[in-house]
């Protein structure tokens, strides 16, 4: 309606006399009343005319411009609000515009278009796309993947040699070197065994198989992403072409089961970057051809589809509408602008991160998708909708897809066309889904009615599970092995048909030109560099705190150094003044260099994501290297500027402006060189422990030969090449020449022993430095050369080096027929055991031969847990306050009541965000923040957390365990500290063995635990270990958080059978569960169902076949009845969803609160809140089960076991110690036997300083990752009340002390003999004591920083602040007596200064000889040490006491920090 007509109507309605216009309006309204559709039809006609005009204008444009213009509704260019209106409204009165597609590709317009395209469903949208393509006769590319006789093998150590002990690691290393020239002792493991198959286009294949069957290996092999250390046999072809003829990495997309992303990027930014790098494929060419044919045929396409296709065909955009489409389809639009996060940065949930991993590959143009375990952490509804979209993509767009799923529910399973069943490396079945049950029935096995087919398929090949599915009553059951199944499939008609198809070669003439990708990267080199540079800028912005912290740290150090080397205390002009100026220059140089040390950490941190992107051909590796180099140039500029501007004039350096800018130039190129060096070291060393150990060794070499510690003339001939190869030497020359060739040092030289005209030249010559101005520019040129060299080597390392992978290991137990195979994080974890799973008893009574309480060695007291009107609040998050929420608190649990009883297994279920884990944490007392309201009682008495921790167990979802111990050692350790002190050792071990048998870990008792996803146990085995560790405490109540999350159906069955066995012993067990299968769900006795917001909507028994739950919901008006055979858990969550509540206009929480069931539950709570007759409240005489002494012994036992099996830390410790010792011994070879001059003494002083400081700093930094991993374990064990924090600190310090003693002896023997110190027993043992003590306090200091900070990264940054201060006040760069009086206290507070004092005093303080000094005279050595260095021999007793004091102080701070500082926020 026009504005005039509308105004007339308003005027009429307001009572004014009707005008001529209002009369016409009234007449028009009467006509409308007679024909209500006329107006809408008229307006639609107007829109169509306008659209035709716009389209005609578009058709007149050149092809290039036409591909970048589209006809769209104006509303889409505003805010998209109208998309939420009815279709009739959306189609009337809306103008259309001819717009630049670039406006439509991003922002609200893109989201509005995606909303409109997907308003019905994804299938309709894809069909609209396909209809346009078919209308002009365009054929879509198709890909067929064939694999014939495919075998994959790996080499691994076997038996006891597979355990990573220090002795084994040394033997394996030596034999590995020998094996390069001879035979290897590794055993060949067959991962895939001559498998055959065809993946066809327009068919979606489900890959099923138990853990270690080879699923990931098969997918990686088919996509060309197998580790190069694996041996591959057989043929893999795409449309008849071998891998050498195209790039499989880009033709197909592999979605890994591991989630590797930049934690600081948002979900949208992550997908945008992958889409940008993966490119558009053939979309632009196809769209151009479609547009040409439409134009020739006079066809006008659907404007919205045309606009969408043009937007997706735009190459090189930073963001694109494809990202919005994938976000919407995967349900990530609600968290699109949330950072991904990691274990230290709070971000999206695990399920959302899994979808990000999937979406990352879906944004690309690949037409073959192989997706590995994409459902981990997702509920069945999300999995179903994602797989359904992929099914539409396959069937409508002719894509080729294989998906591996864990526990696929029946509705998801039925979406697939084909099934591949893989077991023990054999293909048991590969063919249509409809025929797989027929194949197994032909072999005598039938799937029960209420059994999910996918669960049946994963259990029927298991020796332990197979018999229950045998249905031929007239024939005796006989185990059918996996190889037998594989042979039977070959003779089955489906297998015969597939073999025939494989024998017919693929007709290469039929292949679509765009099917296979022959270009290595989607983008040009410039576009790739631009994309990576934009991402690195973004990451740098997100890490701005780190760079601000570094600059702040530099400013603080600058002010500290200014006050030490204050110009008023820095006289110049005399030869003796040069030492202090050289010390100041050297400290400045070290600070600027070491401030770039964080680049090592940042480089190592980026590598996992880089390797993924490199291997997936996102970009050429050199672009990543160049981007990181360029982005850090401003950092070097800022840090060099800050340091020089603050320090130069205050320290009293040469005042000329030219000298100022030359020093700035020297520090700037030095910082660039240091950053390049650290980047290069990070790229080749790859892990933090190795990077720190060998990186510090490289820095030591660079520093020692830097021109200050030892003069060039005093360097041994075999090391002189290192002097010329040390970048720091050129930096030292540049800054020294710049200072000492200034006019104020041009005073005539009076020292006849040095051939130099001026004092400045004499100082330079005395240190072996260049003496001409040419030396400055030569040094700058050399540093630029090093910058180019290190950056080039960095790029080459990125391009050609593969990630460091953990050693392959295989443990074989001939008696138990168990194999455990561990490989790398990027390669599939494989572990095979002949005793796997059996079905969970569906009876709530748990029929079968289960252990009962009477069968256990140790009795326990059954307890019930009641909670009434429970509420939980947290402070309102700042993000939510910014969105306008004014409340101060956010309620996560709302009026929850319930009871958990002995012998009953209770399921705690709800959608994501319902508060399942929150409720469990509140009940278990694990919350560290928030406010709890309501009552919690334990068998009638109020719950006290101190005693409750002793009688309860909590199985966390994360499965946190010490990685370097065996399964048996983990469980025994838990039993040792958690069982009562009156339980003797033999009884304790018997109980441990009973528990291991209960959870079916007895066959894995000697297996290493390892790190999740990296080494050791599989996910399912770790779950059982978590249960065993808690069960061995003999608890009455056990909480389990998501015990089946991330497991396949068979592994979940093992875990749930373990849980069921635990309940049958009479314990109270509560599990949170995430979308369980029918088998798992009906193994529970009771259910507590929560809705979003932490409100109860059902609490009560499940009943046989869940009939009580079903009856309750079916009595609610509007709830649809459950379909026969449908999973009650899935049905329950579907009918109680928020959408269903809105549809029925009900609140299920209110319905429950007003129900008879609620009143019965309240009566039960009241009944259980009264203590039973004769029952007393729990009371323990001591806080912990064991005495402090036993706690220390047990903790030390575990740490000893852990350290012995941690060669990556301890073997590396001793190897680097040997190399450090060898280096110092050869550099300062027999220097201790020749002490004729003051310079000789100073050279030895420099050797002592460097020998102590650098290896100590290495210890300090390398211990931090180890302690950080163990701290996470400590938080779990401490929450369980296992031991005192001080006993843990004692054990951690003690085991380090032991290893440090060995390290100190090794180091002392090497350098003491090679440097040539005096072989007197007293001097040797003094030296040994100070070296061992320094190793200890450095190590304890590193441990202390970890305990005081929330992350190892922050602790590492603090080290880069502390170590320069220790270095400055160590007594070498500036002697004690030269330190200003206001800073001399820090000399005594610095442990390194005490060690250097002790070594110098013990070795040389008591010597009676004299040495020559500048000027030619001779002075007693003890006199020089006292007057110049400030060292006295008679002070040694105090020095020894100081070392004990520093060690004790750091250990105590570590212990009390562990006790009082809890950085785990729950």
Curated annotation (Swiss-Prot):
SUPFAM superfamilies: P-loop containing nucleoside triphosphate hydrolases. Keywords: ATP-binding, Membrane, Nucleotide-binding, Repeat, Transmembrane, Transmembrane helix, Transport. CDD domains: ABCG_PDR_domain1, ABCG_PDR_domain2. Residues 833-843 have a biased composition (Low complexity). Residues 176-449, 865-1117 form the ABC transporter domain. It is a multi-pass membrane protein. Pfam families: ABC2_membrane, ABC2_membrane_7, ABC_tran, ABC_trans_N, PDR_assoc. InterPro entries: AAA+_ATPase (IPR003593), ABC2_TM (IPR013525), ABC_trans_N (IPR029481), ABC_transporter-like_ATP-bd (IPR003439), ABCG_dom (IPR043926), ABCG_PDR_1 (IPR034001), ABCG_PDR_2 (IPR034003), P-loop_NTPase (IPR027417). GO terms for cellular component: plasma membrane. Residues 1-21, 821-851 are annotated as: Disordered. ATP 2 binds at residues 910-917. GO terms for molecular function: ABC-type transporter activity; ATP binding; ATP hydrolysis activity. Belongs to the ABC transporter superfamily. ABCG family. PDR (TC 3.A.1.205) subfamily. This is ABC transporter G family member 40. It comes from Oryza sativa subsp. japonica (Rice).
């Amino acid at each position: 309606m026009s504005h005039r007509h509308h105004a007339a109507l308003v005027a009429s309605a307001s009572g004014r006399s009707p005008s001529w216009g209002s009369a016409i309006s009234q007449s028009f309204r009467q006509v409308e009343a007679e024909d209500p559709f006329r107006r809408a039809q008229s307006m639609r006609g107007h829109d169509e005319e306008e659209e035709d005009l716009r389209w005609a204008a578009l058709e007149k444009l050149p092809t290039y411009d036409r591909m970048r213009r589209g006809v769209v509704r104006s509303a889409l260019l505003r805010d998209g609000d109208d998309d939420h209106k009815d279709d009739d409204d959306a189609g009337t009165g809306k103008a259309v515009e001819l717009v630049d597609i670039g406006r439509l590709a991003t922002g609200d317009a893109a989201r509005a278009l995606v909303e409109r395209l997907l308003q019905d469903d994804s299938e309709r949208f894809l069909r609209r796309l396909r209809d346009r393509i078919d209308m002009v006769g365009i054929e879509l590319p198709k890909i067929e993947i064939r694999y014939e006789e495919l075998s994959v093998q790996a080499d691994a150590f076997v038996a006891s040699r597979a355990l990573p002990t220090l002795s084994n690691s040394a033997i394996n290393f030596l034999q590995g070197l020998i094996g390069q020239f001879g035979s290897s002792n590794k055993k060949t493991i067959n991962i895939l065994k001559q498998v055959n198959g065809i993946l066809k286009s327009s068919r979606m294949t489900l890959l099923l198989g138990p853990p270690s069957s080879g699923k990931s290996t098969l997918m990686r092999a088919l996509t060309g992403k197998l580790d190069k250390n694996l041996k591959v046999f057989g043929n893999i072809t795409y449309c008849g072409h071998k891998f050498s003829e195209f790039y499989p990495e880009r033709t197909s997309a592999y979605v890994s089961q591991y989630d590797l992303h930049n934690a600081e990027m948002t979900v949208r930014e992550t997908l945008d970057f992958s889409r940008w790098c993966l490119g558009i494929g053939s979309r632009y060419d196809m769209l151009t051809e479609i547009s040409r044919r439409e134009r020739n045929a006079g066809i006008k396409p659907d404007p919205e589809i045309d606009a969408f296709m043009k937007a997706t065909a735009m190459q090189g955009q930073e963001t694109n509408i494809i990202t919005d489409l994938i976000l919407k389809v995967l349900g990530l639009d609600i968290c699109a602008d949330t950072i991904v996060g990691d274990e230290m940065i709070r971000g999206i949930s695990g399920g959302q991160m899994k979808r990000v991993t999937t979406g990352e590959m879906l944004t690309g143009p690949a037409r073959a998708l192989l997706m590995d375990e994409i459902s981990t952490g997702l509920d069945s509804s999300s999995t179903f909708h994602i797989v359904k979209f992929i099914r539409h993509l396959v069937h409508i767009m002719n894509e080729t897809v294989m998906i591996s799923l864990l526990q696929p529910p029946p509705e998801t399973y039925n979406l697939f066309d084909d099934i591949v069943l893989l077991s023990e490396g054999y293909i048991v079945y590969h063919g249509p889904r409809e025929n797989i049950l027929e194949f197994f029935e032909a072999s005598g096995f039938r799937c029960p009615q209420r059994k999910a087919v996918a669960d049946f398929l994963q259990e029927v090949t298991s020796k332990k599970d197979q018999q229950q599915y045998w249905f031929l009553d007239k024939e005796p059951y006989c185990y059918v092995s996996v190889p037998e199944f594989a042979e039977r499939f070959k003779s089955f008609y489906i297998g015969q048909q597939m073999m025939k198809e494989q024998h017919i070669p693929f007709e290469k003439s039929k292949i679509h030109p765009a099917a296979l990708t022959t270009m290595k990267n989607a983008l040009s080199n410039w576009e790739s560099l631009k994309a990576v540079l934009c991402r690195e800028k973004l990451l740098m912005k997100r890490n701005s705190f780190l760079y601000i912290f570094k600059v702040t740290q530099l400013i603080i150090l600058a002010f500290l150094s200014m006050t030490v080397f204050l110009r008023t205390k820095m006289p110049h002009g005399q030869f003796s003044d040069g030492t202090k100026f050289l010390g100041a220059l050297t400290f400045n140089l070290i600070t600027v260099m070491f401030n770039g040390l964080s680049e090592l950490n940042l480089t190592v941190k980026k590598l996992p994501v880089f390797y993924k992107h490199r291997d997936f051909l996102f970009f050429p590796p050199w672009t990543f290297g160049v981007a990181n180099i360029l982005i850090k140039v401003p950092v070097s500029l800022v840090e060099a500027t800050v340091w020089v501007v603050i320090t130069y004039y205050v320290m009293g350096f040469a005042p000329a402006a030219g000298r100022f800018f030359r020093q700035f130039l020297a520090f700037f190129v030095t910082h660039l060189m240091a950053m390049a060096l650290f980047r290069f070291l990070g790229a080749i060393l790859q892990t933090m422990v190795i990077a720190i150990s060998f990186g510090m060794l490289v820095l030591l070499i660079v520093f020692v030969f830097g021109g200050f510690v030892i003069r060039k003339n005093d360097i041994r001939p075999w090391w002189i090449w290192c002097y010329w190869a040390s970048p720091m030497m050129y930096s030292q020359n540049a800054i020294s020449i710049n200072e000492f060739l200034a006019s104020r040092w041009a005073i005539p030289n009076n020292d006849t022993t040095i051939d130099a005209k001026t004092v400045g030249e004499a100082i330079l010559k005395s240190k072996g430095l260049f003496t001409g101005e040419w030396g400055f520019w030569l040094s700058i040129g050399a540093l630029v050369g090093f910058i180019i060299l290190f950056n080039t080597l960095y790029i080459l390392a990125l391009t050609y080096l593969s990630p460091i992978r953990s050693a392959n290991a295989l443990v074989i137990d001939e008696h138990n027929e168990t194999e455990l195979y561990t490989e790398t994080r990027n390669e599939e974890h494989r572990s095979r055991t002949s005793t796997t799973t059996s079905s969970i008893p569906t009876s709530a009574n748990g029929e079968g031969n289960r252990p009962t309480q009477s069968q256990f060695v140790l009795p326990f007291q059954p307890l019930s847990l009641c909670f009434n009107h429970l509420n939980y609040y947290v402070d309102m998050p700042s993000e939510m306050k910014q969105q306008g929420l004014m409340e101060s608190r956010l309620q996560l649990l709302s009026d929850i009541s319930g009871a958990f009883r002995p012998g009953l297994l209770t399921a705690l279920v709800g959608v994501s965000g319902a508060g399942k884990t929150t409720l469990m944490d509140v009940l278990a007392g694990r919350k560290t923040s928030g406010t709890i309201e309501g009552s919690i009682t334990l068998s009638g008495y109020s719950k006290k957390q101190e005693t409750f921790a002793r009688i309860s167990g909590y199985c966390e979802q994360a499965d946190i365990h010490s990685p370097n111990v065996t399964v048996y050692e983990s469980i025994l350790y838990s039993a040792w500290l958690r069982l009562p002190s009156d339980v003797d050792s033999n009884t304790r071990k018997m109980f441990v063995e009973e528990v291991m048998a209960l959870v079916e870990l007895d066959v894995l008792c000697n297996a290493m635990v390892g790190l999740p996803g990296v080494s050791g146990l599989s996910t399912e085995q770790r779950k059982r270990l978590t249960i065993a560790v808690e069960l061995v405490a003999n608890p009455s109540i056990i909480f389990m958080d998501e015990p089946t999350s991330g497991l396949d159906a068979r592994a979940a069955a093992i875990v749930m059978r373990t849980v069921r066995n635990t309940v049958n012993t009479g314990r109270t067990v509560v599990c949170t569960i995430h979308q369980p299968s029918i088998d798992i769900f009906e193994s529970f006795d009771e259910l507590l169902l929560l809705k979003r917001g932490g409100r109860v909507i059902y609490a009560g028994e499940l009943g046989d076949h869940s009939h009580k739950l079903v009856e309750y919901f079916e009595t609610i008006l509007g709830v649809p009845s459950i379909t026969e055979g449908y999973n009650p858990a899935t049905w329950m969550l579907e009918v109680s969803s928020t959408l269903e509540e809105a549809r029925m206009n009900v609140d299920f929480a209110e319905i429950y609160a007003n129900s008879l069931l609620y009143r019965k539950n309240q009566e039960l709570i009241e009944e259980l809140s009264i203590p039973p007759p004769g029952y007393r409240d729990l009371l323990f005489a001591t806080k912990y089960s064991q005495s402090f002494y036993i706690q220390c012994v047990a903790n030390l036992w575990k740490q000893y076991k852990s350290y012995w099996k941690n060669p990556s830390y301890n073997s590396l410790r001793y190897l680097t110690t040997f190399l450090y010792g060898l280096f110092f011994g050869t550099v300062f070879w027999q220097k201790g036997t020749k002490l004729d001059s003051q310079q000789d003494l100073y050279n030895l002083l420099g050797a002592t300083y460097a020998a102590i400081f650098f290896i100590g700093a290495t210890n300090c930094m390398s211990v931090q990752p180890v302690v950080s991993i163990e701290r996470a374990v400590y938080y779990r064990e401490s929450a369980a009340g296992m031991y005192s924090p001080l006993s843990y600190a004692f054990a951690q310090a003690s085991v380090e002390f032991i290893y440090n003693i060995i390290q100190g002896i090794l180091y002392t023997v090497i350098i003491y003999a090679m440097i040539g110190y005096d072989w007197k027993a007293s001097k040797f043992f003094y030296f040994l004591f100070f070296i061992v003590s320094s190793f200890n306090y450095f190590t304890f200091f590193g441990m202390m920083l970890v305990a005081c900070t929330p992350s190892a990264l922050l602790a590492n940054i603090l080290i880069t602040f502390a170590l320069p201060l220790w270095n400055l006040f160590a007594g070498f760069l500036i002697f004690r007596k030269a330190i200003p009086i206001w800073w001399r206290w820090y000399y005594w507070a610095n442990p390194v200064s005490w060690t250097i004092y002790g070594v110098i005093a013990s070795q040389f303080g008591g010597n009676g000889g004299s040495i020559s000094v500048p000027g030619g005279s001779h002075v007693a050595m003890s006199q020089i040490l006292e007057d110049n260095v400030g060292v006295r021999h008679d002070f040694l007793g105090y020095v020894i006491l100081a070392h004990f004091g520093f060690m004790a102080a750091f250990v105590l701070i570590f212990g009390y920090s562990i006790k009082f500082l809890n950085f785990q926020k729950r």
